[in-house]
Design a protein with these regions (language model features):
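Redox-cofactor-proximal catalytic regions of oxidoreductases
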Residues: 1
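C-terminal flanking tails of non-heme Fe-dependent oxygenases
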Residues: 4-194
């Protein structure tokens, strides 16, 4: 055990949650809703901090070897701190994969599926993937900003109209996350052929 590690990570978690709250306030301003809308929905958040290691590719011809296949994140927003190895790609509005190179002192901010539901796709989830770097280990520290488990996820005020009705049924944070996990890991429940 590293001396002071737990204290350091607990503080980092709190700092990341505070940064997430600041970004969520900016979203409320952009959407024209009450500025403290998210505050009461993030009193006991289920946000997650992960540490991810991506092993290196060993040959230039294994470019299709991915550290993480194309996906969107489940929650509200994701704050990603990358190391200098690179490998993160995002899909642009034309469907092209573009590099999201690490920039020292910055975070990548991805919109997640829960925010897309809340905003009725005014904010859309960010499709992304990781291509393992050639000959270099890659490390990242994503922070998944998630509300209280019982928070109702439904179309925000002003994000729907007669001509643009709500695209998604109402749910709760817990119900939505559990359904996404169940879909993602369905293969683990399927009987294995012998």
């Amino acid at each position: 055990e590293l001396d002071g590690w737990q204290t350091l990570m607990e503080q980092h978690y709190l700092d990341m949650q505070a940064l997430g709250q600041t970004l969520l306030q900016a979203i409320t301003v952009a959407l024209g809703i009450e500025r403290d809308f998210f505050d009461k929905r993030f009193i006991e958040p289920v946000s997650v901090l992960r540490f991810i290691h991506y092993p290196p590719r060993h040959t230039a011809t294994s470019a299709e070897q991915q550290g993480a296949g194309a996906h969107t994140d489940y929650g509200c927003i994701t704050l990603l701190h990358q190391d200098s190895a690179g490998g993160l790609q995002v899909r642009d509005v034309r469907g092209q994969w573009i590099d999201a190179p690490p920039i020292e002192g910055t975070f990548v901010v991805n919109i997640g599926d829960m925010m897309a539901r809340w905003s009725n796709d005014r904010y859309v989830s960010t499709p992304h993937r990781v291509i393992s770097p050639l000959g270099v280990d890659r490390y990242s520290m994503p922070f998944f900003v998630e509300p209280n488990p019982d928070t109702r996820i439904e179309c925000l005020p002003g994000c729907q109209s007669e001509s643009q009705p709500a695209l998604y049924p109402a749910t709760t944070c817990a119900e939505f996350l559990l359904s996404r996990f169940a879909d993602t890991y369905a293969y683990r429940r399927e009987p294995q052929a012998s």
